[in-house]
Amino acid sequence: MSLPRFRLVQGKAIGERSTPGVSTPEPAPPQIKQEVDYQDAHQMAPEPVEAPQAQNHQMQPPRQPIQQQMQHFQSPSPMAPQGPPGTPQNSAAAAAAASDDKNVTKCVRFLKTLINLSNNDDPEMPDKAARVKELIRGVIYLETTAEEFTRNLQQVLKSQAQPHLLPFLQNTLPALRNAVRNGTASVEGVNPPPGYVFNNGRTPGPPQPPPPQQQSQQQPPLEMRQIPNPNQIPPQMVQGGPHMVSVGARPMIRPMGPGGPSPMGLQGPVRGPMGHQMVQMHPPPPPQQIQQQHPAPPVEMEVEENLQPTAAATATRQYPEGSLKSSILKPDEVLNRITKRMMSSCSVEEEALVAISDAVESHLRELITLMAGVAEHRVESLRIPENYVAIDDVKRQLRFLEDLDRQEEELRESREKESLIRMSKNKNSGKETIEKAKEMQRQDAEAKRNRDANAAAIAALSSNKTVKNKWENTGAATTAPRPRTVRVTTRDLHLLVNQDSRFTGTFIREKMSYGGPAVDTTI
């Protein structure tokens, strides 16, 4: 009986069709097809463009409203209100004003206490109170320095030097002088000198009675206004007391127009000495006397009356308080030195004085800057500048060699230990070899414990901060170093004088040349 024969035939897999389909080649990728189309298009003859233009004309109407809508949303409204910009300067100015007011209050309280303490009867010095008031008047109105005031006050009161008094006065006196000049502060019992001029132009005079109730409502002072007709009502200013203002070369004049006379105004500009214009302001008369006043006097009569009392006020320039803190030269001292060398009939114009002072100050500042640069180059180190990079470190190389020697020593010791341990395990080894191997194992275990304990203690006591080298922090991203005091020596000045051509033939160069180079023992 023969066994049936079977033939293995490949059947369908999961998801396949029962009848195998015809395999079709995959279509070419679109990029290849586009390339063929492009090549054919180059070979084709150009066609007329009337049809595409017609299509464009047909497609333009629906695009136009879309563009208009986009313009409608993108174009900002011309009438949109804009918010006020931020004013960080106003807050800083308010903080500075509050600090100045606080300094003024402290200084006034201190001066009042000083006057009260000096009023005590002293048989040895009966004029102590008057002398103290004179010192206070000088330091407030006559620009006496705080050092002179402190020294004279110690002599008058016969007291010891107070270390905190001079810094306090240097910090608070500028604010007090500014407030006194503006008329917002005063010290009881201390009157200004006769020639003192305030910022608002008024000069110290006898106290006036308070104005009536009808004049209580004050109006803000306006700028200079010119009255078109001298026969009109005289000018009025609500500020109490007669004022005398020294204005610059050309004041701003606002014409009042063809209307009636203004209740507030100033008389026409009057030519004064040195090209200045003197303007006189009068106190406001009562309302019932306005109709009975006579016409204003002509301008020529006022020039003769006001020329003498204002000569002292215009002789010197009034600088705002605090403007000369950073100045090397004070114009008042320069003016005094110039006038001493001139004849009594000569005068110094303000513009020339300011030009000389500014030129000399600029020259001195430039020389000081150059000398500071020379001193910096003299004392600078090679590690600090960013132009130098550390390319070799001898200490690190020595440390590396020491580490290599230590590793070789440890390797040699470990080999000896292994040989001893191997010999101790041999049955033929003596008792001394076994004891020596055990002792070495005990020492190794103790040394390992000590190393682990020391590492744990160092990790617990040390911080996480890593010490970086100085040259790693140099670069544009690092912060600027703190400004430090530069010590300029005579050697720096000698080098600058010899190199600068502006010192050729000057007295200082000849003096330093005859004296020879300076020797600094501290270097």
Swiss-Prot record:
Lineage: Eukaryota, Metazoa, Ecdysozoa, Nematoda, Chromadorea
Region (Necessary and sufficient for interaction with oma-1): 333-382
Principal subcellular localization: nucleus
Gene that encodes it: taf-4
Domain remark from Swiss-Prot or TrEMBL: The histone-fold domain mediates hetero-dimer protein-protein interactions.
Species whose genome carries this gene: Caenorhabditis elegans
Residue ranges constituting the TAFH domain according to the UniProt record: 101-199
InterPro entries, A to Z: TAF4 (IPR045144), TAF4_C (IPR007900), TAFH/NHR1_dom_sf (IPR037249), TAFH_NHR1 (IPR003894)
Biased composition (Low complexity): 58-77, 214-236
Subcellular location: Nucleus; Cytoplasm
Pfam families given in the database record: TAF4, TAFH
Protein's UniProt name: Transcription initiation factor TFIID subunit 4
Described function: The TFIID basal transcription factor complex plays a major role in the initiation of RNA polymerase II (Pol II)-dependent transcription. TFIID recognizes and binds promoters via its subunit tbp-1, a TATA-box-binding protein, and promotes assembly of the pre-initiation complex (PIC). The TFIID complex consists of tbp-1 and TBP-associated factors (TAFs), including taf-4. Essential for early embryonic development, probably acting via activating transcription initiation by RNA polymerase II, as part of the TFIID complex.
